[in-house]
């Protein structure tokens, strides 16, 4: 099945054509326009600017995707689009673009959950991956643990109660003077630092829960930096990055371990923008190897927002009988 997919949930505009089947998961084209340089000026994503940039980019990306794939709109069999969750103005652009294409060419339309699409990115890197599995989705806007019983059956068993893990990285990076987005630079600095030099709290919430809270961890790091500045103390940025990274990764891996015990799953999927973090990939790999679990990580180039993952999940939504019509509306929340 040839699927046209659209992604515009935050600040990346993406259009892809994927071919999906019982034994086929293939990306024919995936064109993405990043707004990072624009939002870097403001230290974070400005929703109104993001939605306007989506409008400017989406049509040309669609043309480019068709050119690269060597096919025409008439050949498309399904249109999939991220409809929730995300920035409402950004989602609005992608949803209406997808609805217009579906209407103009008489194609079926499928709405896709953005966090489910991130997990689906792992299918593209692991052709034999099938549910059930435990999915850890970690990004700048979302952090959740889901028991994936089937391709479209997700049960969230743990999530952040406040900031997402990626948001904590970005906000600490900003205080450290690192331009947005700071996650990648924090990852590099952490490789050069000593995680034992500073103690920061865990993000795992105490009690009978798999939830996390990154707000307290973020505040603890920022307070450390501000106190050091007021005292005139020297701050070793590499050590701060290393200690922060260890707190984040160890908290996430701890929750994965607890979730595995509760669900009995033997396969773990790691996806989302923060899934590109080298320390998280290494620590989770070590844990899974030690405990005899299979780990399927989304390919690094598909960890960020992209339409290929949306098209992949759209295929399974379609097979499950999930359809949308022209009344489809974007939603900021799940």
Task: Locate the predicted segments by residue.
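N-terminal beta-alpha supersecondary unit
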Residues: 2-85, 96, 114
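A contiguous, well-structured pocket-lining segment that forms one wall/lid of small-molecule binding clefts
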Residues: 30, 188-268, 277-287, 291, ...
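Conserved phosphate-binding catalytic cores of ATP/NTP-utilizing and phosphoryl-transfer enzymes
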Residues: 111-134, 313
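Conserved phosphate-binding/catalytic loops in two-lobed NTP-binding clefts
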Residues: 111-112, 268, 284-309
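Short beta-strand scaffold segments in enzyme catalytic cores
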Residues: 13-19, 135-137, 143-147
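Glycine-rich phosphate-binding loop plus the immediately following alpha-helix
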Residues: 127, 150-194, 218-219, 223-228, ...
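Glycine-rich phosphate-binding/hydrolytic loop that grips phosphoryl groups
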Residues: 120, 298-334
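Short Gly/Thr/Asp-enriched flexible loops that form oxyanion-binding sites at enzyme active sites
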Residues: 81-105, 278-287
């Amino acid at each position: 099945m040839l699927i046209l997919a659209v992604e515009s949930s935050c600040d990346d505009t993406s259009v892809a054509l994927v071919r999906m089947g019982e034994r086929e998961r293939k990306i024919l084209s995936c064109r993405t326009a990043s707004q990072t340089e624009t939002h870097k000026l403001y230290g974070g994503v400005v929703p109104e600017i993001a939605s306007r940039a989506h409008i400017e980019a989406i049509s040309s990306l669609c043309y480019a995707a068709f050119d690269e794939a060597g096919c025409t709109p008439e050949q498309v069999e399904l249109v999939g689009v991220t409809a929730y969750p995300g920035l409402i103005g950004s989602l609005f652009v992608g949803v209406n673009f997808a609805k217009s294409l579906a209407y103009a060419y008489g194609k079926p339309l499928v709405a896709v959950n953005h966090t489910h699409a991130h997990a689906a990115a792992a299918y593209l890197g692991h052709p034999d991956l099938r549910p059930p599995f435990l999915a850890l989705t970690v990004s700048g806007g979302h952090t959740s643990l889901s028991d994936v019983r089937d391709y479209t059956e997700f049960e969230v068993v743990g999530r952040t109660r406040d900031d997402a893990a990626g948001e904590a990285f970005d906000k600490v990076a900003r205080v450290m003077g690192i331009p947005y987005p700071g996650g990648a630079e924090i990852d590099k600095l952490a490789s050069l630092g000593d995680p034992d030099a500073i103690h920061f709290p865990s993000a795992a919430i105490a009690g009978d829960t798999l939830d996390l809270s990154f707000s307290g961890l973020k505040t603890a790091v920022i307070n450390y930096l501000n106190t050091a500045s007021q005292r005139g103390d020297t701050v070793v940025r590499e050590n701060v990055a290393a200690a922060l990274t260890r707190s984040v990764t160890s908290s996430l891996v701890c929750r994965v371990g607890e979730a595995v015990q509760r669900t009995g799953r033997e396969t773990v999927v790691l996806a989302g923008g923060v899934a590109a973090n080298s320390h998280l990939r290494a620590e989770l790999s070590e844990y899974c190897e030690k405990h005899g679990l299979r780990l399927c990580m989304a390919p690094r180039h598909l960890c960020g927002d992209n339409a290929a993952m949306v098209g992949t999940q759209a295929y399974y939504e379609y097979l499950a009988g999930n359809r949308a019509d022209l009344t489809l509306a974007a939603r900021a929340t799940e």
